[in-house]
A protein has these predicted regions:
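A short, flexible loop at the N-terminus of ABC-type nucleotide-binding domains that lies
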Residues: 2, 11-25, 75
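The feature captures the beta-strand-to-loop junction immediately N-terminal to the Walker
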Residues: 39-41
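Helix-to-loop junction immediately C-terminal to a conserved catalytic motif
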Residues: 54
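Conserved ABC transporter NBD signature motif
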Residues: 62-70, 230
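ABC ATPase NBD coupling module
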Residues: 70-84, 89-92, 114-117, 121, ...
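H-loop/switch region of ABC-family ATPase nucleotide-binding domains
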Residues: 207-208
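Conserved beta-strand-loop-alpha-helix hinge in the C-terminal portion
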Residues: 227-251
Length: 260
């Protein structure tokens, strides 16, 4: 098992009148090579789960194992050696004031004791161009352009490439197409699928786009109020349709008095 969340308890505003229990003995497991699409309504626990995995947040109880090793107390920075993350906001994964080349060199030097200039040589520059060619956006010809001048789609594509530059073992995609226009969103998913397939990297993708959840990945998980209410893979995942997911969402809504 690559990732194993065991008996997680997560409470917000603990000990106050606003105390809210999200996870109460939550279990979640991911095998190596899985591409898991995670869906669910707002407040279902999707992003909190990602934050716990990456180390951006901590649970009150439970364990997080990565390849059998307990990483529950491991700081976020150290987890970044083997976990890459792309956020919803295209601005979050790159530095606007630096060029494309400088952003990639900075990522290339992550966890190393070298200056920025160490990575900027002809060999590395050619390597960066080759990585950017996969985006099919012409970014390989704009290495000296400031990232702040790129479109949202271009910047998110760069963030995805950067997240995959080092030897990460788990890729976290946190609604990484949500802030993009429809065309850029489709381009981003094409690039995402291509990069994941090429590397065979284990991936968790949180999305509100049900079609993307159905069309991409080999496993689909639906969350609701801190619980997994649907978990399918294999032939079930291949046969899944958007309408099936909508029906489950509606059943949940009816149970909570919000059905139509």
């Amino acid at each position: 098992m690559m990732l194993d969340l065991q008996k997680i308890v997560k409470i917000f505003n603990e000990g106050t009148v606003d105390e809210a229990v999200l996870f109460d003995g939550f279990d979640f497991h991911v095998k190596q090579g899985e591409f898991v699409s995670v869906i669910g309504s707002n407040g279902s626990g999707k992003t909190t789960m990602l934050n716990l995995i990456c180390g951006a947040d901590a649970a009150q109880e439970g364990k997080i194992l990565f390849r059998g090793q307990d990483i529950t107390m491991l700081p976020e920075l150290k987890r970044a050696k083997f976990i890459g993350r792309v956020f919803q906001d295209p601005k979050a994964g790159t530095c606007a004031g630096l060029t494309i080349l400088e952003n990639m060199a900075l990522a290339d030097n992550k966890q190393k004791h070298f200056g920025l200039g160490f990575a900027i040589n002809k060999k590395r520059t050619d390597h960066y161009r080759a990585l950017l060619e996969q985006c099919e956006m012409g970014l390989e010809n704009r290495l000296n352009v400031k990232v702040g001048s790129l479109s949202g789609g271009q910047r998110q594509a760069l963030a995805l490439v950067i997240a995959n530059m080092t030897d990460i073992e788990l890729l976290i995609l946190d609604e990484h197409t949500a802030a993009l226009d429809p065309k850029s969103s489709e381009t981003m998913m094409y690039l995402t699928d291509k990069l994941i397939s090429q590397r065979g990297i284990t991936t968790l993708m949180v999305t509100h786009n049900l079609r993307h959840a159905v069309e991409y990945g080999n496993r689909l998980v639906m969350m609701h109020e801190g619980n997994i209410v649907k978990d399918i893979c294999g032939e079930q995942k291949r046969q899944a349709k958007v309408q099936d997911l909508l029906e489950v969402f509606n059943e949940i809504s009816i149970e909570n008095g919000n059905g139509v």
